[in-house]
Amino acid sequence: MTEKLREISLDTETTGFNADQGDRIVEIGCMELINKIPTGEKFHVYINPERIVPAEAIKVHGLDNQFLKDKPVFSQIARDFLGFIGSDPLVIHNAQFDMKFLNSELRRMGISALDNPVVDTLVMAQKMFPGKRVNLDALCRHFKVDNTNRTLHGALIDANLLSSVYLHLTGGPNHALDFGELEDAPGKQAPKKRLSRSMRTRVRTASPVK
């Protein structure tokens, strides 16, 4: 009997880029994957960040102060969030960013940092497609994942798209990798193309990113 591997595709939206300088999470979206396939089980919540959301951040995700003011604060949703992810691997695009914010929120509550294994799909894509643009939109275009509903960043939408991209990055349903379709990253010339031997990374305490 095949062993079931449970993973969680995860994304967050925030008030900015700097958790160390007081930026907070405003949305968490998670999708359950069993053997890389979404089950339909999800965790999704909007969060009152207990601070003003800057206009620059609102332009990214559309979550303004009026919308968020009556939403629960992180400490009110933490138990449900931790219960949903358990100790299973987290699949995140640019994992350092999200992990730093999640651990910052947990630290405010006196809870230790997450020690779940983390699969960083950004690292995977950079190794698969060196020198190419590998943001989520670029990968959706490359793998022909429909992202027409992604007019703004949204944690649940992005977690759902990421689950499809992850399936392709790990071999997909009989998917043949084509390295020629992605755009070159700015100022970079693609080196010789090769696949990495290991695509998994573990993050305990994230460092500043973006």
What are these regions (language model features)?
Residues D64, V73, N135, V203-K210:
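General structural signal for secondary-structure boundaries
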Residues G187-K210:
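Acidic, Ser/Thr-rich low-complexity intrinsically disordered segments
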Residues M1-N116, Q126-F129, A138-L152:
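Conserved non-catalytic scaffold segment of RNase H-like nuclease domains
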